[in-house]
Amino acid sequence: MEFVKCLGHPEEFYNLLRFRMGGRRNFIPKMDRNSLSNSLKTCYKYLDQTSRSFAAVIQALDGDIRHAVCVFYLILRAMDTVEDDMAISVEKKIPLLRNFHTFLYEPEWRFTESKEKHRVVLEDFPTISLEFRNLAEKYQTVIADICHRMGCGMAEFLNKDVTSKQDWDKYCHYVAGLVGIGLSRLFSASEFEDPIVGEDTECANSMGLFLQKTNIIRDYLEDQQEGRQFWPQEVWGKYVKKLEDFVKPENVDVAVKCLNELITNALQHIPDVITYLSRLRNQSVFNFCAIPQVMAIATLAACYNNHQVFKGVVKIRKGQAVTLMMDATNMPAVKAIIYQYIEEIYHRVPNSDPSASKAKQLISNIRTQSLPNCQLISRSHYSPIYLSFIMLLAALSWQYLSTLSQVTEDYVQREH
């Protein structure tokens, strides 16, 4: 199937082949775990089990920031598991989430009542909290603070609907913006990045909001099926009486209008994303931050004006994801990628769409203010004949290529 999808994109096919034949290791070097303590090895095992995508880029981080981010991720995953578990009553969830930061300092605390897929991070929380306490104090302080603030925010929205666009921003801040702020403070604390990276909480928050809004927009149907609602009523209420009404065939037109309005809302974070990424100096940190962002803008471009969002999960092509991962290693390339996808959106904006003028104006502002002198260019450096030859050669060994690592597919799936 991936071969068929790549027929119209030979450069993606070539990059898939390069990635499978060793290009992945040039970008994401394999981490040597032999020297790690048993508890830290276990943490990385849980990281592999709960998120292959983040496991890859976390393990590519330099120095001690790698372990700090690994532990931070597992703690957040544990909190997210509590929040998402529909088998746990709200009455039990609220104190768990509000007090979760205190469990970091309780060596024996664990939670064994979860039925969620990733419950192991709760059942063996003593291993994770041990490695938390083994971190440098400068990292512990950041992680505990973010954990406390996020737990209170999650608890707040257990009994509260996402009604207004302000509520949407607030919820996304609690579950993703705080992650961006926490990571930024870790990067600065490690001295891999300048203090401004950790101090500018507005840009760090936008990094998280852009990713979270993309996930919420794309995962409309999945969330509906699971009984979750994250689209703001202030927007969808203009088109239907109930959010689930968008799946009805007779509502396809208004569903797409609502979708486009939400995507337009998400695009407003792009200037902050560009500012944030332009400040990064460490290559491993840049890769860690840039890749999810370019995946997000590509996903929004795929979702824009696309009624398939209401029929299933819209994914970018695996070859497209690989190409983005391999390209997004420097700021000029990232700007070119962003420019490409906002142009795709711009040219698909229906004139009759209620948010059309706002979308076009927003994209025009991004062009002139955040992407000056940037132009739409092909990122392929290979001749059509050469690419065709590579495709023919690769087709003969496609069975081998079919074992391609799942790391790229996970990048375009929702992170809980």
Curated annotation (Swiss-Prot):
Q: What, per the annotation, is the impact of changing residue 288 to D/R?
A: Completely eliminates the activities of both the first and the second reactions
Keywords from UniProt, A to Z, are: Cholesterol biosynthesis, Cholesterol metabolism, Disease variant, Endoplasmic reticulum, Isoprene biosynthesis, Lipid biosynthesis, Lipid metabolism, Magnesium, Membrane, Metal-binding, Multifunctional enzyme, NAD, NADP, Steroid biosynthesis, Steroid metabolism, Sterol biosynthesis, Sterol metabolism, Transferase, Transmembrane, Transmembrane helix
Which ranges of the sequence are coiled-coil? none
Extract the Pfam families matched here: SQS_PSY
Query: In the UniProt annotation, what is the result of changing residue 283 to E/N?
Result: Retains partial activity of the first reaction. Retains partial activity of the second reaction
| Outcome of substituting residue 174 to F/S/W | Has little effect on the total squalene synthase activity
Its transmembrane ranges are 284-304, 384-404
Q: What is its main location?
A: endoplasmic reticulum
Which InterPro entries does the entry mention?
Isoprenoid_synthase_dom_sf, Squ/phyt_synthse, Squal_synth-like, Squalene/phytoene_synthase_CS, Trans_IPPS_euk-type, Trans_IPPS_HH
The linked condition is: Defects in Lss and Fdft1 are the cause of Shumiya cataract rat (SCR). This strain develop mature cataracts at around 11 weeks of age, exhibiting opacity from the perinuclear zone to the cortical intermediate layer. Cholesterol levels in cataractous lenses decreased to about 57% of normal. Cholesterol insufficiency may cause the deficient proliferation of lens epithelial cells in Shumiya cataract rats, resulting in the loss of homeostatic epithelial cell control of the underlying fiber cells and ultimately cataractogenesis.
Record's family? Belongs to the phytoene/squalene synthase family.
Function noted in UniProt: Catalyzes the condensation of 2 farnesyl pyrophosphate (FPP) moieties to form squalene. Proceeds in two distinct steps. In the first half-reaction, two molecules of FPP react to form the stable presqualene diphosphate intermediate (PSQPP), with concomitant release of a proton and a molecule of inorganic diphosphate. In the second half-reaction, PSQPP undergoes heterolysis, isomerization, and reduction with NADPH or NADH to form squalene. It is the first committed enzyme of the sterol biosynthesis pathway.
Q: What is this protein called?
A: Squalene synthase
Say which species the protein is native to: Rattus norvegicus (Rat)
- Which gene holds the coding sequence for this protein? Fdft1
